[in-house]
A protein has these predicted regions:
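Conserved nucleotide-sugar phosphate-binding/catalytic loop shared by glycosyltransferases and other
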Residues: 5, 22-66
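Short beta->alpha connector loops at strand-helix junctions that form conserved
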Residues: 51-55, 107-111, 130-131
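A conserved, positively charged/aromatic
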Residues: 105-107, 114-129
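A nucleotide-sugar donor-handling region in carbohydrate enzymes
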Residues: 128-194
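An amphipathic, basic-hydrophobic alpha-helix
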Residues: 59-81
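Glycosyltransferases and closely related glycan-assembly transferases
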Residues: 44, 74-85, 91-105, 119
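Short amphipathic alpha-helix
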Residues: 8-22
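Nucleotide-activated donor-dependent transferases that construct or modify glycoconjugates
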Residues: 1-8, 187
Length: 199
C-alpha cells in the first residue's frame, strides 16, 4: 500500500489505518509533502517516509509541484510495486495508479475543491466521501456515515490529555477559543476567500 500525505491532518487521518494494516502483515510505504508540520508528525509517530514535494505559494507553483510530485511518486511506485495507492484529495495517487494499472482510493470531504477534484476524480478508482457530501461523483463514489476527523478523534481511538491545558496555563473548566489562520494558497482554496471585512 502506498499512501501519499499532503497535509498534517492526513497523518492523523491515516495513522490508525497504517498501524492496523501493518499488524495484519501489509507493507505500507508513505510519501509525504513538506507542508507545515507533516514531516514532523510522521517522525513523532515513528513512521518511515519519503519526502516528495514542498509547499510553495501561488497557483502556478501549485500546478508545477503537482506535476513534479506525480513524477516523484511514479518513480517510487515503480520501485515499490504497491497493490493500491491512497490519499486525501490527492491527484498524484490517482494519476500514478492509472499509469501503473493499479487501484487508487481517494478520500475527500471538500466539495468546493473543484479544481483539485476535477483533476483527481476522473483517474481515481474509488472516491470515499462522508454521506453529507452533496456532490455525486458517480458509481466510483462510496459514501460513509462519518467525518474524516473521526478516524483519529473517535472515542475508541482518542483520549484527551488534560496536561495540554496546563502547558497553556488553562484549567479544565476555563473557556477558550481556537482560531486557525490560513494562507488561502491550497488547491481547495482556488476561487475561495476568507472574511473580507476588517475585524
Amino acid at each position: 500500500i502506498l499512501i501519499d500525505m499532503g497535509h498534517p491532518g492526513h497523518v492523523h487521518f491515516f495513522k490508525n489505518f497504517i498501524w492496523e494494516m501493518e499488524k495484519k502483515g501489509h507493507t505500507v510505504l508513505i510519501t509525504a509533502r513538506n507542508k507545515e508540520i507533516t514531516l514532523d508528525l510522521l517522525s513523532k509517530y515513528h513512521f518511515d517516509f519519503i519526502p516528495v514535494g514542498r509547499q510553495k505559494s501561488g497557483k502556478f507553483n501549485l500546478i508545477k509541484e503537482w506535476v513534479l510530485r506525480d513524477l516523484q511518486i511514479l518513480k517510487i511506485a515503480r520501485e515499490f510495486h504497491p497493490d493500491f495507492l491512497m490519499g486525501i484529495g490527492n491527484p498524484s495517487v490517482a494519476h500514478v495508479a492509472k499509469l501503473l494499472s493499479k487501484k487508487s482510493l481517494v478520500f475527500t470531504d471538500t466539495e468546493h475543491a473543484k479544481f483539485a477534484n476535477g483533476v483527481t476524480f476522473p483517474f481515481a478508482d474509488v472516491i470515499c466521501t462522508p454521506s453529507c457530501f452533496n456532490y455525486d461523483a458517480g458509481p466510483k463514489q462510496v459514501r460513509y456515515n462519518g467525518y474524516h476527523e473521526l478516524a483519529y478523534l473517535h472515542p475508541n481511538r482518542f483520549t484527551p490529555n488534560p496536561d495540554v491545558l496546563t502547558e497553556l496555563d488553562l484549567a479544565e473548566d476555563d473557556p477558550f477559543i481556537i482560531v486557525r489562520f490560513v494562507s488561502w494558497q491550497a488547491s481547495h482554496d482556488v476561487g475561495q476567500h476568507g472574511i473580507r471585512d476588517k475585524v
